[in-house]
């Protein structure tokens, strides 16, 4: 594989394309696009905003073509292609120096686009291929912004609750606010705001479409490290992220795809023994813990969602619909 090169030294302003994958997000998409039109674009060229709609049924893309002064392109799929595949689809028709993969349940602020672009443009930052910013919620409080690469030990700590009881010994996958107070190099940027050099994105072949949703950015970030590029988190630049914009509508499906993508990640990147251990823990200890939590909450809907999510996973495993290795 030819190593991607940074953009430094090329003439003219850096250019940016924004890719948004939408699935039944209601008015969130409109708010997201509206915020882009208000963001600072001096110092770079915002070439295109591409919205890939994965067969939404709520009319969330209706009447948005002329919402912004920036050119907006809509790609409408007749079936839900999955998040990773739709991201690749949106990026395929663009040519800018940088790609920003942005969730429709986000809203950017004045410098949300410019600051990470400026960081990646600096010559001394050529080793960084991915950049992200601080995420905030409705109240303005910190929301998950970056993470460490998940190991079998990290997953075990999460499944058993040990990462909450003994966070010093059992670190969590998602980094805590106390770890994100200052700008720093991190393993992984959260995919809701994922700025990447086009050269790196193309060299890695984009996101792995076998991750229908979840873990696609974890996999990409790990492959970027293997190619010699790092991820950087900017603590002083923010973006609003609601979280769960579309997945809140189908919680059983969300659980299934989260577990499925996790297992696929394990079998793709771990040793076979560690991947097998991850699958065994997921299908025993974690399943029991989730069922007990649902029963303890006295929530029938939560119990049903858990049973449905795991049932779908068992069907997927039994029918060998997971292709573990490339």
Model-derived features with residue positions:
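Short, flexible, basic/aromatic active-site loop/helix in glycosyltransferases
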Residues: 150-186
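Conserved donor NDP-sugar-binding/catalytic core segment of glycosyltransferases
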Residues: 109-145
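A short, conserved alpha-helix in the catalytic core of glycosyltransferases
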Residues: 181, 187-238
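N-proximal low-complexity "stem/linker" segments adjacent to membrane-targeting elements
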Residues: 1-38
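Glycine-rich, basic loop-to-helix element that forms the pyrophosphate-binding segment
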Residues: 76-94
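Non-catalytic, C-terminal membrane-associated alpha-helical segments of glycosyltransferases
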Residues: 253-261, 272-326
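Short aromatic/hydrophobic "clamp" motif used to bind/position activated sugar donors
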Residues: 99
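A conserved acidic beta->alpha catalytic loop
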Residues: 35, 53-62, 79
């Amino acid at each position: 594989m030819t190593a991607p090169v940074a953009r430094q030294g090329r003439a003219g302003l850096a250019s940016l394309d924004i890719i948004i994958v939408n699935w039944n997000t209601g008015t969130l998409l409109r708010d997201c696009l509206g915020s882009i039109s208000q963001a600072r674009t001096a110092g770079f060229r915002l070439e295109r905003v591409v919205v890939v709609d994965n067969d939404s049924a709520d009319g969330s893309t209706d009447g948005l073509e002329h919402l912004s002064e920036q050119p907006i392109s809509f790609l409408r799929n007749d079936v839900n292609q999955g998040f990773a595949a739709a991201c690749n689809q949106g990026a395929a028709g663009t040519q800018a120096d940088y790609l920003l993969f942005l969730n429709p349940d986000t809203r950017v602020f004045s410098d949300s686009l410019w600051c990470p672009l400026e960081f990646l443009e600096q010559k001394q930052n050529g080793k960084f291929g991915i950049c992200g910013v601080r995420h905030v919620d409705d109240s303005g409080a910190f929301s998950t912004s970056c993470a460490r690469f998940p190991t079998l030990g990290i997953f075990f700590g999460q499944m058993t609750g040990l990462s909450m009881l003994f966070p010093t010994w059992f670190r969590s996958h998602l980094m805590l606010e106390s770890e994100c107070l200052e700008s720093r190099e991190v393993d992984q940027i959260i995919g809701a705001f994922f700025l990447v050099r086009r050269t790196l994105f193309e060299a890695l072949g984009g996101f792995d479409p076998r991750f229908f949703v979840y873990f696609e950015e974890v996999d990409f970030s790990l492959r970027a490290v293997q190619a010699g590029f790092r991820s950087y988190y900017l603590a002083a630049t923010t973006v609003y992220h609601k979280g769960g914009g579309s997945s809140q509508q189908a919680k059983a499906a969300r659980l299934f795809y989260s577990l499925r993508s996790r297992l696929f990640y394990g079998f793709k990147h771990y040793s076979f023994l560690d991947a097998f251990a991850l699958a065994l823990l997921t299908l025993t200890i974690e399943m029991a813990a989730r069922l007990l939590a649902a029963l303890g909450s006295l929530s029938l809907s939560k119990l049903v969602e858990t049973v449905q999510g795991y049932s779908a996973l068992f069907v997927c495993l039994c029918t060998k619909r997971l292709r573990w290795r490339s």
